[in-house]
């Protein structure tokens, strides 16, 4: 066999073993806990740190930033990689706080599958619906985990109906809960035709002990109260008679969601979910690019930057580019082309990511996410490649809803202030705009919610040593002008708005309210305004 054929076979085998997914949920649905339990079953950690039953337990592995540890919320995306039964899994952990939907969107651009986490007591919540729409836009397969079954909640059949009616998805319950709240006894696996009975252990900090009983085994009556058993049998009959059959083609097309029930905190159903997910999930697929769809088994390496993070290691003040490998084989120290600038870049010190912990890696394949040292070369959406030039679709910016000048009251900290703004802007922690008035040089922070302002101020102080102040602006809508500055000049004077420029120097109109926006549309029908920024492919940030 020739060397080329050997490499192609190696790439094909590696891609078959890759599974990549992001978890989406409303805040407090238990996302960080589920993430940790998947790592626990994958052997990546030995004791789950999300559980606060004992003081000596470590903080949640995926919440690594200082502010996250202080507040107990996820405010930045991280990547967690682990192996399970010969699969290489890339888990993209997304922010749980609603202010960070934009960072979540960028992460979903790198994911092949999404896991939708739902609180059994609350059902579908606003943030879940919003993120579901982003998944639908991207055509991602969606797997649903109904969490907190060990607490009082809504009827499982009612939850299935809500998903079908509100999201327009067909549902297939892969497992089914037996009891709920204090009477929750475990789950029935429809794949195995067996009941998994679980026992609480150390508040779920270690893998759950379980007994498995086949349906029809007389022992069932020893474990389950008669009423629970009859209710379970009745539910099962309804599912079998009225429910859809599992259709993986429909799952992969994002039209059907396999549903799992469990409790991440106490480990009920977590391993069953992981094993079924690995069997059903989409492996890395072809991606749209400037040269058409490129398959992950294509022999030449390519990938795109979906996230930048400064100061992941506070001791070294480093900057890391998160790259989704799309095709071919990545190798340490390889030289690649940078599509936006046309420059060649040597990729030394590549890293396998695990929250803030990193280890050097020698190789990676389609579906993997790697960390690259970023000496100011990369921007979000950048493509790197070997061989024939190609560029993947960029990642758009969404319309912010809050605006504020960020001021530096201490002139002696000017350099640190500028460095912090530049790095946080490149990272996409917040959108930054500037006034068109040359006398107003303070950057305008443009955020989805208030927490983003707090994060920027916190990081400016803790990472760059700069105390800052905010001067809020009375605007709530931003619209990009298609056609740029020339279109704006032709329109002449515009009332009910101010004009600012974005990171790429493009004109953006800010409005105080929807009425102001509609008035400008009436007065200037020739202006084409967009709530999503044009993708900055082939452009240099200002």
UniProtKB/Swiss-Prot annotation:
SUPFAM superfamilies: EF-G C-terminal domain-like, P-loop containing nucleoside triphosphate hydrolases, Translation proteins. It comes from the Bacteria. Residues 16-285 form the tr-type G domain. GO terms for molecular function: GTP binding; GTPase activity; translation release factor activity, codon nonspecific; translation release factor activity, codon specific. It is found in: Cytoplasm. CDD domains: RF3, RF3_II. One of its GO terms (biological process) is regulation of translational termination. The keyword GTP-binding applies. Belongs to the TRAFAC class translation factor GTPase superfamily. Classic translation factor GTPase family. PrfC subfamily. Coiled coil: none annotated. It comes from Crocosphaera subtropica (strain ATCC 51142 / BH68). The keyword Cytoplasm applies. This is Peptide chain release factor 3. Increases the formation of ribosomal termination complexes and stimulates activities of RF-1 and RF-2. It binds guanine nucleotides and has strong preference for UGA stop codons. It may interact directly with the ribosome. The stimulation of RF-1 and RF-2 is significantly reduced by GTP and GDP, but not by GMP. The gene is prfC. Keywords: Cytoplasm, GTP-binding, Nucleotide-binding, Protein biosynthesis. It holds the Pfam family EF-G_D2. GTP binds at residues 25-32, 93-97, 147-150. GO terms for cellular component: cytosol. InterPro entries: EF-G-like_DII, EFG_III/V, G_TR_CS, P-loop_NTPase, PrfC, RF3_C, RF3_dom_3_sf, RF3_GTP-bd.
């Amino acid at each position: 066999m020739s060397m080329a054929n050997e490499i192609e076979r190696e790439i094909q085998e590696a891609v078959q073993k890759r599974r990549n997914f992001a978890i989406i949920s409303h805040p407090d649905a238990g996302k960080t806990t589920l993430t940790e339990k998947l790592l626990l079953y994958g052997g990546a950690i030995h004791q789950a740190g999300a559980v606060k039953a004992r003081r000596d337990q470590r903080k949640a592995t995926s919440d690594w930033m200082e502010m996250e540890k202080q507040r107990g919320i996820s405010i930045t995306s991280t990547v967690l990689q682990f192996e399970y039964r010969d699969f290489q899994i890339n888990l993209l952990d997304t922010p749980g706080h609603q202010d960070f939907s934009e960072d979540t969107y960028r992460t979903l651009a790198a994911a092949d599958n999404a896991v939708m986490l739902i609180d059994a007591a609350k059902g579908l919540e606003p943030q879940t619906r919003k993120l579901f729409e982003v998944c639908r836009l991207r055509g991602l397969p969606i797997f649903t985990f109904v969490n907190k079954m060990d607490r009082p909640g809504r009827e499982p059949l009612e939850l299935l109906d809500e998903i079908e009616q509100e999201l327009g998805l067909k549902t297939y319950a892969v497992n089914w809960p037996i009891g709920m709240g204090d009477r929750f006894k475990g789950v029935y696996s429809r794949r195995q035709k067996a009941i998994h009975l679980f026992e609480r252990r150390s508040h779920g900090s270690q893998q759950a002990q379980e007994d498995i009983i086949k349906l029809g085994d007389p022992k069932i009556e020893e474990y389950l109260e008669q009423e629970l058993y009859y209710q379970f049998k009745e539910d099962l009959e309804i599912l079998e008679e009225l429910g859809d059959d599992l259709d993986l083609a429909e799952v992969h097309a994002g039209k059907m969601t396999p549903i799992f029930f469990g409790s991440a905190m106490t480990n009920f159903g977590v391993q069953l979910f992981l094993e079924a997910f690995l069997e059903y999930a989409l492996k890395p697929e072809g991606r749209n690019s400037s040269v058409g769809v490129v398959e992950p088994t294509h022999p030449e390496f390519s990938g795109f930057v979906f996230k930048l993070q400064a100061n992941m290691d506070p001791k070294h003040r480093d900057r890391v580019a998160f790259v989704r490998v799309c095709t071919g084989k990545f190798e340490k120290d390889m030289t690649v082309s940078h599509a936006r600038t046309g420059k060649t870049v040597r990729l030394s010190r590549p890293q396998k990511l695990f929250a803030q912990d990193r280890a050097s890696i020698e190789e990676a394949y389609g579906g993997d996410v790697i960390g690259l040292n970023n000496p100011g070369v990369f921007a979000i959406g950048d493509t790197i490649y070997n061989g024939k030039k190609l560029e993947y679709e960029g990642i758009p910016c969404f319309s912010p809803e809050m605006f504020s000048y960020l001021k530096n009251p201490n002139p002696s900290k000017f350099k640190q202030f500028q460095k912090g703004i530049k790095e946080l802007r490149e990272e996409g922690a917040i959108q930054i705009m500037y006034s068109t008035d040359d006398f107003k040089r303070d950057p305008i922070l443009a955020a989805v919610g208030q927490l983003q302002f707090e994060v920027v101020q916190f990081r400016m102080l803790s990472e760059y040593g700069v105390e800052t102040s905010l001067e809020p602006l009375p605007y709530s809508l931003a619209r990009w002008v298609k056609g740029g500055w020339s279109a704006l000049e032709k329109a002449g004077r515009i009332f009910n708005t101010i004009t600012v420029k974005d990171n790429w120097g493009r004109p953006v109109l800010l409005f105080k309210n929807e009425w102001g926006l509609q008035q400008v549309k009436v007065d200037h029908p020739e202006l084409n305004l967009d709530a999503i920024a044009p993708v900055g492919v082939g452009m240099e940030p200002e």
